[in-house]
Amino acid sequence: MVACSLLALCGLKMPPANSQELNRRTTSQSAPEVNLDQVGNISLTLIHQADRLLADQQWDEAIEVVRGVVRTDGKRLIAVNAGKAKTEGPYYLTVQQYAQGWFASLGQRAPEALVRYRRQVDPLARRWFIEARKTGDRTLLQRIVDELFASSYGDDALLLLGEYGLEEGDYTAARFCWEQIFSQPRGGLAPDHQHAVHGRPFWMQLRLLNSNEAWAAVMPALQAAPAGRPWLTCPNSDLERAAIFARLVLVSVMERHEQRARRELEYLGRLYPGEQGRLAGRTGSYVKILEDLLARSANWKQVAASTDWSTFAGTVSRSATPARSIDIRHVPVWFQSLQHWTAEQELMSLVRPRIAEDMQGLLSCFPVIHRQVVYVNEQTRIRAFQLQDGSPAWNPADATGTIFDSGIARDQLLLEGKHFGVVRGTLTVHRNRLFAKVGSPVSVLSQRADPLVHPTGYLVGLDLDAEGKLLPGFPLRPDGPDWAFEGAPVIDGNQLYVGMRRRDQVRSHAYLACFELDSGKLRWRVLICSAETPGQGQWPEITHHLLTLDHGMLYYNTNAGAIAAVRAADGDIRWLTTYPRRTFRAGAAEGAGRHFFRDLNPCLIHRGILVVAPSDSQQVFALEAATGALLWQEQSGKTDDIVHLLGVVGDDLVASGDYLYWLDLYKGHLRRQFPDAVDNDLAAARPDPRGLGRGLIAGGEVYWPTRETIYVFRREVARDAAAWQLHRQIDLLPRGVSGGHLLICNDRLLLVTANRLFAFRND
């Protein structure tokens, strides 16, 4: 998909206005530099030259200059708000995407130039489109969108791609394709956009219209093309507007997003009340078809979700919310001992108390559950137990349940002296195959370390149908001592995706890589960003940055000043958003904010909204997943202890650390905090109760573990208002356990402490 903004050359549009606030609040400390693979000065000069040629009506010459820049630098990045203050947080697209915006803008800037451009590219676009429609080749359709967006066939390709996305249940992709056909679905509520919230989805702006008078005031703006066209849309599309917007409403209905569907349906009824056509297998009034479909959707059965817990946070979208609630009344039905890890030499832990865990007992293990078997990665080995009784999964003679042994003793992995980061053990199961990073947890060696004697970390892939036999091509090892895998990969089809780090003498480089599962062969590897990290080459670093996968798009929180969306099929960066970083200062509490304890913090995605809590920023913020545009940031200043993004219930984002928080998913407002806040000063008392471990959302309830109790919150509705109330408490001490990570599968609740794995019967 082509990413967001229409980019008029060099007079590049500002990113969403609220991104200025995001950066203003985070510039009180020095901001370490983030380096990207940006386009060079020669290409930037050529882009300026193309604009001047266009102004002089030298159409063909201007077009050829831009096409030439794409040929030489199409994969490199360009800031869409070039020339603005650095504190405003640049937003980046590839040069190829930028060029599509330039060509699309010709429809308004120089219509004759658009005619000439289409004479050049339409024959190829037509050939690709006819072949794609005949064979169902979506790759060709995507090439039209990527490379020939402003051709006469760009809108037709988007229409068909959206249909394919709808068929597959990829509602985010379908919506974004159709929104690019016309500008109105991305417009604002005023002709000049001054009163619109740039980047915020249109339906969220429609929520402001609560009366006929309010609608009447904005109807002229809604009926006209938005001034300035802040979003990339097809120039001069001849497709029927009502039909396209009816499809957008259909997506909301199919997604069961009732609030958005009702707002968009009202918009459709007011702007196109009498339009008719074929939709959802019926012919007639678009409005009547959708009204009937929306009414019937209330009785649709929910799709049964998998009961497995296949990776960190349950799913690769990092937002699992099991349907079954929890009620344990007994002592554990079984337990197993776990490898014990501490943070006694971890530099951040020496400055300030850890968040939601203890220095002497790290909650390092994050098990997965697959086909009634529990798998645990202890870094030196992987173990498997039967969910029902805790017995070894395959070899009864081995009471430890070990299914893979790295051959590296725990003592060999212990770091001598101080270091950054702590050990985390994650796994991913996909189609009865298990993947994990084992061996050394260190991702960046100190400059003093001897790489020839230090053990390395590597990826294993185990065939669970063959009792843990290594898959062909595994283990996967990094290219050398300067390279490291970040953590457990995510899997899609025959492709394995994983974050990688490379260290030189100056900075650390964050990459995304794709390997073929059947051979272990590297398919592609793309540089995301380069930046200084806390160790600065003086201390070893342990990092564990996980990817988020949603319908063919990878989202990567680098914790190094950049968030990126990368297309899984080919490794193309679709957008990259930066934010000002904070510098960790060892030995100084004021330079060691609680947010630095965020380590297992992948992006959480829910219905097209990407929530991010980077470790090098005190902010929690949300981006639109399709475009990277900033939707909101949490501004209370109270949430820098958030280390776990637990999921979404209704329109509430639930997150936790030492406290438990509820935030408005669409605005970022802090709705509730439990318990009440205490002074955040280092010398102040910690909250009571205090979070201990990662909770979960199940059956619409929030389960928050503390040392002695699991607190259960339920959303109570009264007088058209909803509020989260403490519903009950599950006492842990009488059961002989303390708090820790929670996960659930069928009739078992697992609780993971620093040194034991407990299983309870979920009654």
Predicted regions and their residues:
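N-terminal leader/linker segments that initiate helical-solenoid repeat arrays
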Residues: A17-G68, T72-S105
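Repeat-blade elements of multi-bladed beta-propeller folds
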Residues: A243-A246, S306-W309, D358-R381, S406-L459, ...
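Beta-strand-rich domains and repeat architectures in extracellular enzymes and scaffolds
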Residues: V303-T380, V438, G487
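Short solvent-exposed coil/turn linkers within tandem alpha-helical repeat scaffolds
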Residues: E33, D37, R71-Y98, Q108-R116, ...
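Short loop/turn segments that connect beta-strands within beta-propeller blades
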Residues: Q386-D389, L464-E467, E516-S519, R567-D570, ...
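Long amphipathic alpha-helical scaffold segments
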Residues: G89, L93-L124, D238, S252-V331, ...
